Amino acid sequence: MNEQYSAMRSNVSMLGKLLGDTIKEALGENILDKVETIRKLSKSSRAGNEKHRQELLTTLQNLSNDELLPVARAFSQFLNLTNTAEQYHTISPHGEAASNPAQLSSAFERLKESKDLTERDIRDAVESLSIELVLTAHPTEITRRTLIHKLVEVNTCLKQLDHNDLADYERNQIMRRLRQLIAQSWHTDEIRKIRPTPVDEAKWGFAVVENSLWEGVPAFLRELDEQLEQAFGYRLPVDAVPVRFTSWMGGDRDGNPNVTAEVTRHVLLLSRWKAADLFLRDIQVLVSELSMSECTPELLELAGGSEVQEPYRAIMKSLRSQLSSTLSYLEARLTGEERLPPKDLLITNEQLWEPLHACYQSLKSCGMGIIADGRLLDTLRRVRCFGVPLVRIDVRQESTRHTEALAEITRYLGLGDYESWSESDKQAFLIRELSSKRPLLPRYWEPSADTKEVLDTCRVIAKAPQGSIAAYVISMARTPSDVLAVHLLLKEAGCSFALPVAPLFETLDDLNNADDVMTQLLSIDWYRGFIQGKQMVMIGYSDSAKDAGVMAASWAQYRAQDALIKTCEKAGIALTLFHGRGGSIGRGGAPAHAALLSQPPGSLKGGLRVTEQGEMIRFKYGLPEVTISSLALYTGAILEANLLPPPEPKQEWHEVMDELSRVSCDMYRGYVRENPDFVPYFRAATPELELGKLPLGSRPAKRRPNGGVESLRAIPWIFAWTQNRLMLPAWLGAGAALQKVVDDGKQEQLEEMCRDWPFFSTRIGMLEMVFAKADLWLAEYYDQRLVDEKLWPLGKQLRDQLAADINIVLAISNDDHLMADLPWIAESIALRNVYTDPLNVLQAELLHRSRQQEKPDADLELALMVTIAGVAAGMRNTG
């Protein structure tokens, strides 16, 4: 195994040395010596040397205020460089890319070997493949965009250094560039000074498309084509759209007053502007490349007739002109200038597709397939994947905002208070109004600001070019009327198309009731007629885990999906399940392949729709090569889940999970909700209060400014526990429940479930990953430094529970150590721990010092923020 990681360790060592040189040049030998002493002590401490652990604590506690910031920055920047080397390792010929068989080809081999599948079954599954990745602006990307660009270039340099035939001067040039990039990073503030706006977040999303996905998606589809041809002898249809991207940036207003109707309108324009800009660049390349004169009669006519010498170029130049005028018009709109749209304004994907596809068909017909399947095919694939909107937008709003808006309308009209009506009365009113030809909204009525905002958002949707809005998601959906209310508000706004409206079920009770709600909805004739046989439902992972703990939440999510699949199948409805997963385990995060194969059978028939959140976007799609790998993983897993589904779990496994769910939920809530010491302990032992000062995202950390834990959003809740290494939301309750079932004599049954049921084995695997990242001595150190002594018994209780949980999980998985079956992740965690541990100790020290001061010193605060960023990099996830 050491050989497999030697190239990565060599890169980490080289980058560390270059960072050391930069620090020495900037701050002198003394600071570098101090950093190096701390690193060596940390490494020895990790190896079990207790004396060096105490020396590490003493050294960090004795740092002067002047030394705190440079030491924190050194370890934080080193972790960013380590992550970059690790990301390169996943795509390097010396790393994971070489040691793992190609993900697609191995999946296709498994499909071919199955005696139950015909080639037609496989072909149909491939051609109906649907992966929709929803990029969200959850405030978990802590690394500044300016630093991300530098780290991407560091990755490029590592790739160049891997070439065996480099001349000495070429290698020296690359090393010089690496030194420059590391020096630039060191002399750049790693902490944002101001909180990003929703428009800034949307621009970050567009930058991911421009810098990675624009190249990565066509490259992935070429790879898929080649693997299909090798395995089955056919290629993807040119118009296949296996991958699409949607965004919540600029559309997600749930709990974020900064996302207004005007912001959404602006982001929709910005998205179209960026699409026109990117397609214009593509077309300019094609103008240069498509210089051929031979073509079909149909194309010659399209190009302008027999006088045209270079018909392909003529068509490309016409498209170039159209894109230029579209770009100019959208630029004017973005600056607030009212201008008549040009006659050739690009509004639909077909306006781009038809001339490009005509060129493609002509080239194929004239024996120039090699040219057709080059950059022209890439552009056609981009039209299908991104299109004129670039990324479609989801609008998300909380259910009570719609209820309050309708209540204001009914009170004004003298119909009573909608909010106080029974569910059956609400439904009767909504169906009557949805079926009515007359408008509900009074003409000259002046609504309150909140209601006006809800209605204005619906009007933005109604006026948006068709295809630019993907869905309307209702958070905290609890009843059929929550869904019908949105349909009515959209109708009143003049929405002429049937926009998918997805209820989001996210608490334990709501997940348990999801099937009842959808059964009631599907029994309404008007609703069945309106949705035309298609329904989207979103499953919330983060809030359910915060509400009930991970074990109870994951079982409720599984059961809700299973019930919804069966209900929709029975009703003849095509169900798309939309998974609201986060990057961390406490918010539903899991390695993609394991997560997909652990879903209930049939859950991916309608395709995969899943959120990609915060820092996970960079880890999974930050480079074109990483994008190819991530999409290949998803593709292989979806095809296997649909064509080779796991067997239905046994009834007794269901019963064991019911018991695990009940016991774990009771224990989790016993601590989080019922123990009066828990909230004071949480506030003292974690940097929860200090996290609010980090300008991470546009959304406030709390739903209600003065609320307790229950009002805290799932992201800062998990972020805080990740920082002090107790990782509590990702395990509390789970191990105790497993122990109870073992004590009841069912260990063999648990081992069987772990062996034969992907859902359960994935849960155990996720617990192992959390335990590998958690750290008992660091969590104890936070308590000693920050927590009132009278709360220490609670901290000890939680740490003892964590230690017991680790033992029970190892007993069930029959392993001697954590992550035995995922050595790559274990190696990755071990590599980063040496640099994360000093940051944790430093963070506890900084929290201790800053909490002693009435007005914390600005340098102390900055150093604290740097440690938070560094620990986030070390843990590879924040919230």
Swiss-Prot record:
Matching InterPro entries: PEP_COase, PEP_COase_bac/pln-type, PEP_COase_Lys_AS, PEPCASE_His_AS, Pyrv/PenolPyrv_kinase-like_dom
Gene Ontology annotations of biological process type: carbon fixation; oxaloacetate metabolic process; tricarboxylic acid cycle
EC numbers, comma separated: 4.1.1.31
A Pfam entry, by short name: PEPcase
Record: active site: H138, K546
Cofactor(s) annotated in UniProt: Mg(2+)
GO cellular component, one term: cytosol
Reactions catalysed: oxaloacetate + phosphate = phosphoenolpyruvate + hydrogencarbonate
GO MF: magnesium ion binding; phosphoenolpyruvate carboxylase activity
Record keywords, A-Z: Carbon dioxide fixation, Lyase, Magnesium
Keyword Magnesium in record: yes
PANTHER family in UniProt: PHOSPHOENOLPYRUVATE CARBOXYLASE (PTHR30523:SF6)
HAMAP family, per database record: PEPcase_type1
Functional summary from the UniProt entry: Forms oxaloacetate, a four-carbon dicarboxylic acid source for the tricarboxylic acid cycle.
Family that this chain belongs to: Belongs to the PEPCase type 1 family.
Name this polypeptide is given: Phosphoenolpyruvate carboxylase
Gene name in the database record: ppc
